[in-house]
């Protein structure tokens, strides 16, 4: 990979050149590197992630507990949550230099710390949640994390880092045809105070803006705002990986504006060799 930044100090720092067929995880890591030239790092240190080219990227990664069963489960989790969704040719073309298995990925920004399911930079993707709690993760939690990881992969890595995935204005124009002021810089406020009673799909959006004011005890004072363009796209990216194609089809049949926006995302992904409508979740 041309953007590979971290050159191992010793010939096989990450133990990727040694095959051990009796150890399924080591065998997988070895084969994965042979096939994709991508290093799976199971015990990341600061040197593996601290700097993104020359800028400090502001993240702190906690390596997984180095117990065999946790690393084994982490590899399985990586496959289920990301790798299995894509074809070999797509992965060969689009994986970064390394994938970091992490117990926790924290991002510090403006004095606030966010725990992330996934972080993408020019040379690596860090996957969080690799811990003993994988054993007790519910299906519902898994679906949400998988959606978030893939949304992050496309929005951050494929779009921001590599510039390969771009969404045309038609995406936002579809919603503006329904409500011209939806993305008003002064905030478009939905009529109604109960978010459960607002038909967001009618506007082509998934839900309300995180800048909304919602108090369950005093619903009359609620202010429910439409998402900003950036929020709208981020919510959609999670949505297309959280719902099955059949569920999305049903929603698109009922709401033409949802179909228009889904098609814009699908077309942009098709240009990168991935067919969202054939996604198997």
Summary of predicted features, one role per range:
Residues 140-172:
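Catalytic Zn2+-binding segment of zinc metalloproteases
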């Amino acid at each position: 990979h041309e953007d590979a930044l971290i050159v191992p100090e010793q010939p096989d720092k990450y133990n990727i050149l040694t095959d051990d067929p009796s150890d399924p995880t080591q065998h997988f890591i070895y084969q994965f590197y042979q096939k994709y030239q991508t290093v799976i790092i199971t015990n990341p240190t600061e040197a593996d992630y601290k700097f993104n080219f020359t800028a400090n990227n502001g993240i702190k990664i906690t390596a997984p507990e180095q117990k065999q069963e946790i690393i084994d489960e982490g590899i399985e989790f990586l496959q289920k949550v990301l790798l299995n969704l894509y074809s070999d040719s797509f992965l060969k073309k689009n994986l970064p230099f390394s994938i970091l298995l992490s117990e926790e990925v924290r991002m510090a920004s403006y004095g606030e710390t966010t725990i992330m399911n996934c972080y993408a930079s020019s040379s690596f993707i860090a996957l969080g949640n690799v811990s003993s709690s994988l054993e007790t993760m519910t299906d519902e939690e898994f679906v949400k994390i998988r959606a978030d990881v893939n949304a992050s992969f496309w929005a951050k890595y494929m779009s921001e880092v590599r510039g390969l995935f771009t969404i045309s204005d038609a995406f936002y124009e579809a919603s503006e045809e329904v409500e011209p002021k939806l993305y008003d810089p002064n905030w478009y406020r939905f009529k109604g105070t109960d978010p459960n009673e607002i038909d967001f799909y009618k506007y082509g959006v998934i839900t309300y803006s995180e800048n909304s004011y919602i108090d369950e005890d005093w619903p009359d004072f609620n202010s429910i705002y439409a998402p900003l363009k950036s929020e709208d796209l981020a919510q959609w990216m999670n949505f297309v990986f959280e719902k099955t194609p059949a569920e999305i089809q049903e929603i698109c049949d009922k709401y033409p504006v949802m179909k228009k926006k889904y098609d814009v995302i699908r077309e942009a992904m098709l240009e990168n060799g991935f067919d969202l409508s054939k996604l198997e979740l």
